[in-house]
């Protein structure tokens, strides 16, 4: 009887240990996709960011390149139209010169009129709005890629929280401009620590001030990683420029993906891991006999 009680007690202890172990397994389950309410240890690596971004770019190359090309055409159209209207509305005065050798030449002086000044001002506003729209659109698509959601070309033209993005962008430009007037360095520092503000506005619908605060906290949590990520993004864009600007169709999407990866990792969020090729099926072939 005592032996039976002993085995029953031993079985009870084993069941309790297994139940506790199962509980530990549940506790160790990874959190659902998204992001926590506070920053965690990110385990960020710029090498992983570059590898992940390139992997995701190769899987969505056309979907990423076409929107960048379309935005580039739109930017060129706004710049060209503004410049053409400014020149057309300005006053031009032609002066002829003849040197001592009898060679004649002309110079054209262009004086901007009030109408031309208004057109230039409106052109700057349109260009600024288009850049923010492009930034928000590309971030929206890249964030969906980071979440593992299917994306299309149209995804990059449907930015989320556009109103918050516009106000956040205006806030960043205003503070950076004021910092630049006081001294160049404060403006540059603020621009650097506020680099994730638009991503917060797009991804988490935070207010402009909260987006800037969250970006400063995120950069402060890993300054070294933020600097390396920024340098990697800059390198991707510069390499694209060196390739006769055609490479920017690749460099800009890769830089945007690095930016999103860094933002998610440093802010305690998650990204869908890169898909690696599966190993070959079956045993490898053995040595061939002659």
Spans of features found by a protein language model:
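Selective recognition of hydrophobic, aromatic-rich stretches within alpha-helical transmembrane segments
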Residues: 34-37, 113-149, 173-210, 237, ...
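Single conserved hydrophobic/aromatic residue that forms the stacking wall/gate
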Residues: 1-26
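Intrinsically disordered, low-complexity Pro/Gly-rich regions
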Residues: 19-20, 24-42, 272-290
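Short, small/hydrophobic-residue-rich motifs at membrane-helix boundaries and re-entrant hairpins
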Residues: 34-143, 169
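Alpha-helical transmembrane segments and their immediate juxtamembrane interface regions
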Residues: 101-110, 200-228, 257-284
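Interfacial aromatic "cap" segments that immediately flank transmembrane helices
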Residues: 43, 47-74, 150-179, 193-241
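Hydrophobic aliphatic residue packing
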Residues: 13, 25-26, 73, 146, ...
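Alpha-helix initiation/capping motif
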Residues: 6, 11, 15, 39-42, ...
């Amino acid at each position: 009887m005592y032996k039976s009680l002993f085995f029953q007690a031993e079985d009870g202890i084993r069941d309790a240990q297994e139940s506790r172990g199962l509980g530990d397994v549940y506790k160790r389950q990874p959190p659902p996709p998204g992001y926590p309410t506070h920053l965690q240890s990110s385990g960020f690596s710029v090498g992983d960011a570059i590898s992940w971004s390139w992997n995701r770019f190769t899987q969505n190359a056309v979907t990423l390149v076409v929107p960048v090309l379309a935005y580039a055409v739109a930017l060129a159209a706004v710049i060209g139209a503004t410049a053409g209207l400014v020149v057309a509305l300005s006053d031009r005065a032609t002066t002829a010169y003849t040197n001592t050798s009898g060679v004649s030449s002309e110079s054209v002086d262009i004086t901007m009129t009030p109408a031309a000044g208004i057109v230039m001002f409106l052109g700057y506003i349109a260009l600024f709005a288009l850049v923010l729209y492009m930034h928000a659109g590309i971030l929206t698509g890249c964030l969906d890629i980071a979440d593992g959601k299917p994306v299309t070309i149209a995804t990059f033209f449907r930015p989320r929280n556009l109103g918050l993005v516009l106000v956040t962008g205006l806030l960043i430009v205003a503070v950076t401009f004021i910092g630049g007037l006081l001294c160049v360095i404060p403006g540059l520092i603020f621009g650097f620590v506020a680099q994730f503000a638009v991503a917060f506005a797009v991804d988490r619908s935070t207010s402009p001030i909260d987006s800037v605060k969250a970006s400063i906290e995120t950069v402060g949590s890993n300054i070294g990683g933020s600097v390396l990520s920024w340098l990697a993004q800059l390198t991707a864009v510069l390499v694209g420029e060196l390739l006769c600007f055609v490479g920017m169709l690749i460099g800009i999407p890769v830089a945007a993906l690095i930016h999103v990866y860094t933002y998610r990792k440093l802010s305690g969020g998650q990204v869908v891991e890169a898909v690696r090729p599966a190993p070959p099926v079956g045993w490898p072939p053995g040595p061939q006999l002659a």
